[in-house]
Amino acid sequence: MFDRATQTLAAIDPEITAAIDAEVRRQEEHIELIASENYTSPAVMAAQGSQLTNKYAEGYPGKRYYGGCEHVDVVEQLAIDRAKQLFGAQNANVQPNSGSQANQAVFFGLLQPGDTIMGLSLAEGGHLTHGMPLNMSGKWFKVVSYGLDAQEDIDYDAMERLAHEHKPKLIIAGASAFALRIDFERFAKVAKAVGAYFMVDMAHYAGLIAAGVYPNPVPFADVVTTTTHKTLRGPRGGLILMTDAVAKQINSAIFPGIQGGPLMHVIAGKAVAFQEALQPEFKAYQEQVVKNATAMAETLTARGLRIVSGRTESHVMLVDLRPKGITGKEAEALLGRAHITCNKNGIPNDPQKPMVTSGIRLGSPAMTTRGFKEEQAVLTANLIADVLEAPNDEAVLERVRAQVAQLTRDFPVYR
């Protein structure tokens, strides 16, 4: 028997408690600008911390390999139905433990080793699961990468030529560091013309898509994968949306293909996040995410920094630091000392090594969750520029830290 009154986390494991408490303070006291991070709601965390973590439930609702699943069946079916409603999908699988595993399931379900796939080059904003040589996707399949044009938009003409030349079995659209809108309809037409499956990895854009402020790929793609955190603001996990034509293959690829028992407590958190995303407030939030990103990009440009592609049309931007003579690694560390968190990131065809880079990636989802509007976004961008323009000036760092402290006090994450 467990005694909730005495067997608390603090009593059982003070070391873990201390680390968690320190991380909570960091999240409250730092401005979070990592584009793939966000703050999830107390309701989502309550679902994740529930006794659903105790339940094994191999299989799918109504078709389990364990008894006692009648209540978790309700939870998973709610998550499925809400995901379908949110994105207008025919089918949804809420069991993937991550976005990478969702992608892996698509490959496992639709492809054979040695098949050809096409995806955006990692060096130009793609994701490692879209064919990076060290990733499973790059080891199991022949990879043809498309890239960006001179304006740093996707080179759709070159993509189409490559597709007709190589006849891939799967064409992937989606990115981890691309700020513009993607023409999913054009991708779909190319895929159909060459007889390929069309997959979209919308992990970065899912929340924007759910709110209608970024194009929805679901009407055009055979299968769409995503994480459930990032802009969607749910728990860490994955989701697959798919047409009737491929649903059986994809579901079988998840279970029993690459996963066993699903994480029912996380699926409950996903269901709660989908419910939150169906509310009008979520649309207003995502609209503000885009406004804040635009305000930051325009301010950084005015301060002499180059935004890759010249602008953002989403939540994310890549900042080319070469005009300031500083690397992404140095900028990440400097801004961290100022209590502004971001990540170093390669720019298209970056001359620097991946652990150094010539750029940083900035995103507005987490700052917008705090309640930041354009005024605070502009101030934050100016603080970033102040630090990058005076990397060796401790007085500037101290001033920026003080301004960040005031901002984070004025806009707490959790009250």
From Swiss-Prot:
Keyword NADP: no
Cofactor annotation: pyridoxal 5'-phosphate
Organism: Leptothrix cholodnii (strain ATCC 51168 / LMG 8142 / SP-6)
Catalytic activity: (6R)-5,10-methylene-5,6,7,8-tetrahydrofolate + glycine + H2O = (6S)-5,6,7,8-tetrahydrofolate + L-serine
Function comment: Catalyzes the reversible interconversion of serine and glycine with tetrahydrofolate (THF) serving as the one-carbon carrier. This reaction serves as the major source of one-carbon groups required for the biosynthesis of purines, thymidylate, methionine, and other important biomolecules. Also exhibits THF-independent aldolase activity toward beta-hydroxyamino acids, producing glycine and aldehydes, via a retro-aldol mechanism.
A GO cellular-component term linked to this record: cytosol
Keywords: Amino-acid biosynthesis, Cytoplasm, One-carbon metabolism, Pyridoxal phosphate, Transferase
Enzyme class: transferase
Subunit structure comment from the entry: Homodimer.
Protein name: Serine hydroxymethyltransferase
Signal sequence interval, chain numbering: none
BP GO terms, sorted: glycine biosynthetic process from serine; tetrahydrofolate interconversion
HAMAP family: SHMT
N6-(pyridoxal phosphate)lysine: residues bearing it: K230
Family from the record: Belongs to the SHMT family.
Localization, UniProt: Cytoplasm
E.C. number: 2.1.2.1
SUPFAM superfamilies named in the record: PLP-dependent transferases
Lineage start: Bacteria, Pseudomonadati, Pseudomonadota, Betaproteobacteria, Burkholderiales
Family matches, as PROSITE patterns: SHMT (PS00096)
Key word Transferase present: yes
